[in-house]
Amino acid sequence: MRISTQTDIIFPAFGIDEGMKIFKEAGFDALDFSMFYMNSSRESVLGNMGEDELVNKLLESSEKYSLPFNQAHAPFPSYRFGDEEYNKFVYEKLKLSIRIAGKIGASQIIVHPT
């Protein structure tokens, strides 16, 4: 069994590499990569990085600290009744989050419907 936690608070506050160090020192075996805020203009997951740069940073730190990503969380809510503008926007972010999850080796991604 692996002990895993979400990256939601630590990565935005400390950055990827320092965050990985914190998680490793705390005793975690794996991580759930949080992409919650890709559903708004607060895209703290990507920051100023492009998809490839983000994936490379995640993989480098994952290898450095021997902390794999066992799963990921997609942006949510993934659908809002009656809000087609949001739904079109978040649909593209859902596809992006699934792509990123696959590239970092997460075997599953959690998608909350609403």
Name these PLM-found stretches.
Residues 1-107:
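N-terminal pre-domain/capping segments
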Residues 109-114:
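Short, intrinsically disordered, charge-balanced linker/junction segments flanking boundaries
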